[in-house]
């Protein structure tokens, strides 16, 4: 740079030469001595010292010209004039960053960042607390990357958050900063309530309305949708704006611009935000509450959203949901986009924002989910939409991935919104829908619906996603919906409480009322459902928001739920899980595709308070939601669900039957659980997709109990076979459908935390818990009893999940005997067979396995002896099959006996062991009981030819086991022969024995 150039005068030998100071360096005269201070702070007082410094390793030499002439650049003559050119200060020096060292670059970057933040904040939050919003707003913005320049500034603002995208947490920080105003960050929750509107992050509109509009898009745009949203938001938000200004605060403002606002505002203007949030809805008022929830979500989400990734926002909020959603998304990734954004976008977007805001908090909490979110992100489109609102949330970055989730968030928000602002519900739920709408997948609900025929109503809604949401309640009048939200606004007041739950319900009901709408909004309905039906959930969401506690999770749940619901048609439905917060009732939107998503609403707890108030409305919501769900899954099915919805809270929705099974058990164990779940779900969803999954249950749980909220739809083939499931629906949705993942189940067990919660199945809380869950899953739908069964839901779940749809029918039959937990399993035998792996996963299986063959035997079984493993190996001949079936069945059925070969043996059922050995060996029951003994016996018992073949194998193993190693060895040799002769198994078997033998020896 200037360094050497300016010293051109140096060559005048003699007399002081004008010197310029290299960029990044400082020259000062102390006590007649000249000191050069390097960019790293080292002080150099002489040319010698300078040369030594420049030649040393690890010293900063930035800012010096390339061919460096030390005497020219460093002039230690105190009298030498200094030309300004070289100073490292000023625009010129900042322009040439190539010559700036990291030290300098960082300093310049920080200065620039602050500068930009100031500008963005100031203009960004025209009226809102510029400062607060400034900071993070930007952060979200940046993530959004969108135009919102403000965003960028924001980023800087965030500084930490600035990383914004990078550091969602920062974002949160920012928020807090923001929050300064409200502390909000946390406030995000608190704020959220007020923020309700926030959620509207629509905040955009809020103060910025116009201005923000653009930014909002960014925020919104954070999500992919942002683009549309920008406009949509703008339009919808802006209007919303009216209340919005405060909304800005909606953390949800998250949209970058708004985010700023909402950030700053977020904290403050929560109330207005709502309107923003729901820009679509007049309900800013109501929105606010929702907002608050939203708000916080957005914070969480926002951050996520902030990340361009849509997902981000949502993701964190719903770990589980995101996971689920991811799974769902995996199945239907496409969905999101479509809906997304189209008409609904604008409106939805607002809702989405709100949702996102609510989500955001949660989101923040669950940063880990990002991964899932990423998955979601794939679905992203919709997510993004949701996220968008959240974008502002600095969090976004962390959850960029989550953004996809975001849609969910939006859904959640919707849910929240639903709950939050009753209308919100409509709004919110619609919001959710809207969010969904934003998110393509969620659109399922709202957005999706537009895209999808599913929501007949949608049509009117379609245009407005948000509208659609609201529309759901009154499809045609999204605005109305928004208005509705207003109504809830009072509810909003209760924001913290169900935040909108109560309000939501009202809204939601309308949605119900709009039965038509349901179809289209099925997802939405699900949201509504969750809102209404699961006031707890919704309430929980809001609560957390207001509380600023984990509840955000609930938002997540909601959003998940929304997503799921939305997913109904769309793959990306995301389960909601209110993890913490509250009881959020789980919603069981059905995923249209087989994919069952089980969403655990983890909300149970917090929401309880909320629940009550919201509870009534919530139930409506739930009811409406369910119908929606029902609709969602099948395009047309919704109607039945509407019917189901009819039974607001408690009734299961027959209609849900069509829905794909989604079960959202309220899970305490949240995200991780869900995450696991989601994986399972993802795996499962596809297979089931063939099946129409029916929502097994979806009972709309009682509004009151968050737990009851759980409804499940079975996606499992079994579930579908369970056509009964629907009837089950009458029952509490016991079927949790395979939807639940084993992990889910496992989580459920953790869930056990509160059976009540679990009770997501309307039914009673207790049994439902893991056992129930598991059972239900197992049965697929057929077995309502699952409730009773608490056995390893996990195993059951796994089984059901893994079971291919093909087997569903068989399972169906068994469902008849779903009464016993195990028995329901038998119903699933085919499933079992299909899912031997499941069997193994099932805890029971392990037991069985272990029981069967204590050490080696079990191993052997695993190796191939076992039914499960054996199955894998055809070499065993039919045995593998029989054994496998039995083994599996045995595992699942326990005493029942093997489905295949074992049916006969069912009496023996002694052990799965037995089944293993016994399948082949009719007799050797005793063997089964004692692993070692059985082995010996097996070896000893040469009678059964089939058995022999096995025997040979066993022998191989047994040799080490049995004391008669020599005899066994001998036997082994003959065994091959005998085997070859007697056993149908190919002579290859003889070889196998060798293999086995080797194996035995090796261990």
UniProtKB/Swiss-Prot annotation:
InterPro entries, alphabetized: DNA-bd_dom_sf, Methyl_CpG_DNA-bd
Biased composition (Basic residues): 947-958, 989-1003
Compositionally biased residues, Polar residues: 707-718, 959-969
Annotated transmembrane regions: none
Region (Required for interaction with ASXL1/2/3): 57-68
Main localization (coarse): nucleus
Function: Non-catalytic component of the polycomb repressive deubiquitinase (PR-DUB) complex, a complex that specifically mediates deubiquitination of histone H2A monoubiquitinated at 'Lys-120' (H2AK119ub1). Important for stability of PR-DUB components and stimulating its ubiquitinase activity. As part of the PR-DUB complex, associates with chromatin enriched in histone marks H3K4me1, H3K4me3, and H3K27Ac, but not in H3K27me3. MBD5 and MBD6 containing complexes associate with distinct chromatin regions enriched in genes involved in different pathways.
Quaternary structure annotation from Swiss-Prot or TrEMBL: Core component of the polycomb repressive deubiquitinase (PR-DUB) complex, at least composed of BAP1, one of ASXL1, ASXL2 or (probably) ASXL3, and one of MBD5 or MBD6. Distinct combinations of ASXL and MBD proteins may preferentially bind specific histone modification marks. The PR-DUB core associates with a number of accessory proteins, including FOXK1, FOXK2, KDM1B, HCFC1 and OGT; KDM1B specifically associates with ASXL2 PR-DUB complexes.
Record-given protein name: Methyl-CpG-binding domain protein 6
Gene of this entry: MBD6
């Amino acid at each position: 740079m200037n360094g050497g150039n300016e010293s051109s005068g140096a060559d005048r030998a003699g007399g002081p030469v004008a010197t310029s100071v290299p960029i990044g360096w400082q020259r000062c005269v102390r006590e007649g001595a000249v000191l050069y201070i390097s960019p790293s702070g080292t002080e150099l007082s002489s040319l010698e010292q300078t040369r030594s410094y420049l030649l040393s390793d690890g010293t900063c030499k930035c800012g010096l010209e390339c061919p460096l002439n030390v005497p020219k650049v460093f002039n230690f003559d105190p009298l030498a004039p200094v030309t300004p050119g070289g100073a490292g200060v000023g625009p010129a020096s900042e322009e040439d960053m190539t010559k700036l060292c990291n030290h300098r670059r960082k300093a310049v970057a920080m200065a620039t960042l602050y500068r930009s933040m100031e500008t963005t904040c100031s203009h960004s939050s025209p009226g809102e607390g510029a400062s607060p919003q400034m900071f993070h707003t930007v952060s979200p913005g940046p993530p959004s990357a969108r135009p919102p320049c403000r965003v960028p500034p924001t980023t800087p603002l965030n500084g930490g958050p600035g990383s914004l995208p990078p550091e969602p947490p920062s974002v949160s920080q920012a928020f807090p900063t923001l929050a300064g105003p409200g502390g909000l960050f946390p406030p995000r929750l608190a704020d959220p309530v007020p923020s309700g509107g926030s959620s509207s992050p629509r905040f955009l509109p809020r103060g910025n309305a116009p201005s923000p509009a653009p930014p909002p898009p960014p925020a919104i745009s954070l999500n992919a949708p942002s683009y549309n949203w920008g406009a949509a938001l703008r339009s919808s938000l802006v209007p919303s704006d009216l209340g919005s200004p405060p909304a800005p605060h909606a953390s949800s403002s998250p949209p970058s611009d708004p985010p700023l606002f909402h950030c700053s505002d977020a904290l403050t203007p929560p109330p207005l935000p709502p309107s923003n949030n729901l820009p679509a809805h007049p309900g800013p008022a109501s929105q606010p509450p929702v907002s608050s929830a939203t708000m916080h979500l957005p914070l969480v989400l926002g951050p996520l959203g902030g990340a361009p990734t849509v997902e981000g926002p949502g993701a964190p909020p719903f770990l589980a949901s995101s996971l689920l959603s991811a799974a769902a998304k995996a199945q239907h990734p496409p969905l999101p986009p479509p809906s997304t954004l189209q008409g609904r976008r604008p409106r939805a977007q607002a809702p989405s924002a709100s949702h996102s805001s609510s989500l955001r908090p949660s989101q923040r909490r669950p940063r880990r989910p990002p991964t899932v979110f990423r998955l979601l992100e794939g679905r992203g489109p919709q997510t993004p939409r949701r996220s968008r609102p959240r974008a502002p949330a600095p969090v976004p970055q962390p959850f960029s991935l989550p953004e996809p989730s975001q849609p969910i968030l939006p859904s959640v928000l919707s849910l929240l919104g639903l709950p939050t602002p009753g209308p919100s519900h409509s709004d919110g739920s619609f919001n959710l829908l809207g969010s969904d709408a934003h998110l393509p997948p969620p659109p399922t609900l709202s957005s999706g619906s537009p895209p999808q025929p599913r929501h007949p109503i949608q049509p009117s809604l379609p245009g407005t996603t948000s509208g659609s949401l609201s529309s759901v309640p009154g499809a045609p009048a999204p605005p109305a919906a928004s208005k509705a939200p207003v109504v809830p606004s009072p509810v909003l007041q209760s924001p913290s409480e169900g935040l909108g739950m109560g309000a939501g319900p009202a809204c939601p009901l309308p949605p119900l009322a709009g039965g038509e709408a349901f179809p289209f909004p099925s997802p939405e309905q699900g949201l509504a459902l969750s809102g209404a039906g699961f006031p707890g959930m919704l309430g929980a969401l809001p609560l957390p928001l207001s509380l600023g506690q984990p509840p955000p999770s609930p938002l997540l749940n909601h959003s998940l739920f929304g997503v799921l619901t939305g997913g109904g048609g769309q793959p990306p439905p995301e389960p909601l899980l209110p993890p913490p917060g509250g009881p959020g009732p789980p919603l069981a939107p059905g995923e249209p595709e087989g994919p069952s998503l089980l969403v655990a609403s983890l909300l149970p707890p917090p929401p309880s308070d909320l629940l009550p108030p919201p509870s009534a409305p919530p139930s409506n919501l739930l009811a409406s939601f369910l119908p929606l769900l029902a609709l969602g899954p099948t395009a047309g099915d919704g109607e039945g669900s509407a019917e189901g919805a009819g039974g607001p809270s408690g009734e299961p929705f027959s209609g849900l039957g069509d829905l794909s099974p989604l079960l959202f058990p309220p899970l305490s164990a949240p995200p991780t659980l869900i995450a696991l779940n989601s994986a399972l779900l993802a795996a499962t969803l596809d297979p089931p997709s063939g099946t129409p999954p029916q929502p097994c249950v979806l009972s709309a749980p009682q509004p009151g109990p968050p737990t009851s909220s759980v409804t499940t739809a079975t996606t499992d083939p079994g579930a579908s076979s369970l056509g009964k499931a629907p009837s089950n629906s009458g029952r509490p949705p016991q079927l949790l459908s395979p939807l639940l993942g084993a992990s889910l189940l496992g989580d459920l067990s953790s869930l056990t935390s509160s059976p009540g919660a679990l009770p997501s199945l309307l039914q009673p809380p207790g049994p439902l818990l893991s056992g129930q869950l598991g059972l239900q899953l197992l049965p697929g739908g057929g077995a309502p009893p699952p409730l009773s069964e608490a056995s390893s839901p996990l195993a059951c779940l796994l089984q059901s999940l893994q079971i291919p749809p093909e087997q569903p029918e068989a399972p169906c039959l068994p469902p008849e005997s779903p009464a016993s937990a195990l028995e329901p399993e038998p119903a699933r035998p085919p499933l079992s067979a299909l899912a031997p792996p499941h069997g193994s996963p099932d805890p029971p299986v392990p037991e069985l396995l272990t029981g069967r063959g204590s050490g080696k035997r079990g191993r052997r079984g695993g190796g191939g002896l076992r039914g499960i493993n054996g199955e894998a190996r055809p070499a065993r001949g039919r045995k593998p099959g029989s054994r496998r079936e039995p083994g599996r069945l045995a595992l699942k059925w326990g005493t029942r006996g093997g489905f295949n070969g074992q049916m006969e043996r069912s009496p023996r059922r002694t052990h799965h062991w037995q089944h293993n050995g016994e399948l082949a060996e009719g007799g050797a029951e005793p063997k089964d009981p004692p692993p070692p003994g059985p082995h010996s016996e097996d070896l000893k018992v040469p009678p059964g030819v089939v058995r022999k073949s096995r025997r040979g194998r066993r022998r191989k193993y047994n040799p080490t086991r049995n004391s008669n190693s020599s005899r066994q060895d001998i036997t082994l040799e003959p065994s091959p022969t005998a085997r070859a002769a007697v056993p149908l198994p190919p002579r290859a078997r003889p070889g196998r024995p060798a293999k086995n033998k080797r194996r035995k020896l090796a261990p």
